[in-house]
Structure formats: structure tokens, C-alpha cells
Design a protein with these regions (language model features):
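Gly/Ala-rich beta-loop-alpha elbow adjacent to hydrolase catalytic centers
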Residues: 51, 55, 60
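Active-site glycine-centered loops adjacent to acidic/histidine catalytic or metal-binding residues
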Residues: 53, 92, 130
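A conserved active-site-flanking secondary-structure segment within enzyme catalytic domains
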Residues: 28-40, 60-88
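Catalytic beta-strand/loop cores that center a nucleophilic Ser/Cys/Thr
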Residues: 84-121
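Acyltransferase
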Residues: 132-161
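Proline-centered loop/turn at the N-terminus of a beta-strand
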Residues: 48-50, 104, 123
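Active-site-proximal beta-strand elements of phosphoester/diester hydrolases
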Residues: 87-88, 125-129
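Flexible gly/pro-rich beta->alpha loop and the following alpha-helix that scaffold active-site loops
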Residues: 1-50, 63
Length: 161
């Protein structure tokens, strides 16, 4: 049996998956199911995935992480440090409680909230901040997203995203 989503994906042949932010996990079951299926498809075909906020939470919970409620992370800015160091915006009520299996932490906030992760062998990253909510995109975000989303292309010299 092939789900309607997988049938659609087989016809459109996406080269990457972007999971956007939005409502909390569990508020809209159909969206949750669809996005988990997108991750299954991306894993099966080794597609790059960029998960923004809720998208990162989906990636993490799919890998076994738990979510916890956090305060002070809605409509604010704060610094993140680690492999990624930046000042970012923040709009989330929940954070992942632990780094999921087969993932590496890329950044944490000052209060030790995990703000970015990457899969250890799949071309997947998750960021809790929202680059799309910035007036000017951060160069670091553009460079990381471009590199990640092009990671499965054979010859990226002439490709534009």
C-alpha cells in the first residue's frame, strides 16, 4: 500500500524537505501525520531536511526525544552558542528535553535549551529560530541552508536555490 502523500512525492520527486514552524505538535493531527510521513520519505531517499522550530521538534520526537515547556522563549531574541554561534529570534513554548539518538547538538541558548541539532549521518538540521521572520536574512543561515539543501545534488556549481 502506498499512501496518497508518498504517491504525490513519487510523482513530484522533491530534492529536499523544509518543515516549517507553526502550531505545537498535537494540535493538528493531520499535519503531524503528514510531516512524520515526509520525514519517513526523506529518510528512505536520503533527502536533505531543514526543520524550523516545530520542524526541529518533529525531527527530534521522531528520534525519541521528549518535549518540555519552556518560558522566556516567545517573541524574544537571545544568543546561541556551540557549533553555531549567533543572535537569533525565538517564538517557541516547547523545547526538546534531550538530544535525540543519532543527532548532534549544534547550538544551545544561555539557559541550556537546545536550539539546533543535526542528524549524524543524514543531511538533516533543525533550528528553533525562525530565519523567515527576520527583516534581513542572516548570512550564516543562508549559507547553512544552501549547503544543506544542495547536499544531495551531484553538481551544485550551476544550481540555484
Amino acid at each position: 500500500w502506498v499512501s496518497p502523500l508518498e504517491s504525490f512525492l513519487r510523482h513530484t520527486l522533491p530534492t529536499a524537505v523544509l518543515l516549517s514552524g507553526g502550531n505545537d505538535i498535537g494540535e493538528h493531527e493531520e499535519r503531524d501525520i503528514t510531516e512524520y510521513q515526509l520525514l519517513d520519505y526523506a529518510e528512505k531517499y536520503k533527502l536533505p531536511v531543514l526543520g524550523i522550530c516545530r520542524g526541529m521538534q518533529l525531527m527530534a520526537t521522531r528520534a525519541g526525544a521528549k518535549l518540555r515547556r519552556v518560558s522566556g522563549h516567545v517573541q524574544t531574541r537571545h544568543k546561541v552558542h556551540g557549533i553555531i554561534t549567533a543572535e537569533v529570534n525565538s517564538y517557541h513554548n516547547y523545547a526538546i528535553d534531550n538530544c535525540p539518538k543519532n543527532h548532534t547538538i549544534l547550538a544551545k541558548s544561555q539557559d541550556q535549551t537546545i536550539e539546533a541539532i543535526q542528524h549524524d549521518w543524514l543531511p538533516w538540521e533543525g533550528w528553533m529560530w525562525h530565519p523567515e521572520r527576520e527583516i534581513n536574512f542572516a548570512k550564516n543561515d543562508i549559507d547553512r541552508a544552501r549547503f544543506l539543501l544542495r547536499s544531495n545534488q551531484k553538481d551544485d556549481k550551476n544550481k540555484k536555490i
